[in-house]
Regions:
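Extended hydrophobic leader/signal-anchor segments used for secretion and membrane insertion
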Residues: 1-130
Length: 130
């Protein structure tokens, strides 16, 4: 490859960019926090990094998921089989689903208000790193 022999300085940025692209499509997930719903844990307008390879999720994990065509960031407060009380009614979280809330309860639109309060595992894009 004569092109790279004469321009080796191009090889490192090109390979680095390709590696980053592969990582972002397969392992990492770049997210954005558009509201104050996760403050003080995550500040409004901050970028966050998640992993697509997250294994088992547990209560307390912060996830990035899709709902109604939007990406949201919330904390898992109950998992499949657990009971939650919402508006005085006890709900059992279905298997492979999660009940989520924002850390800033006064500024979060989350499972407490949705007509279908559960996030299906198939909608989860990533788990927050860190």
């Amino acid at each position: 490859m004569k092109l790279f022999k004469n321009n080796r300085w191009l090889l490192i940025p090109i390979l680095s960019s390709l590696l980053l692209l592969v990582l972002m499509k397969t392992v990492l997930f770049l997210g954005y926090v558009p509201t104050e719903s996760m403050e003080p844990t995550l500040k409004k307008d901050s970028f966050i990094l998640g992993t697509r390879l997250y294994g088992d999720l547990t209560d307390g994990d912060i996830i990035i998921f899709e709902r109604d065509g939007r990406l949201l960031v919330k904390r898992i407060t109950a998992s499949g089989g657990e009971a939650v009380v919402r508006n005085g009614i006890t709900l059992i979280v279905p298997e492979n689903c999660y009940y989520v809330q924002g850390d800033n309860a006064n500024h979060s639109y989350d499972s407490r208000f949705w007509s279908d309060p559960f996030v299906k595992e198939s909608r989860i894009k990533a788990k927050l790193l860190g």
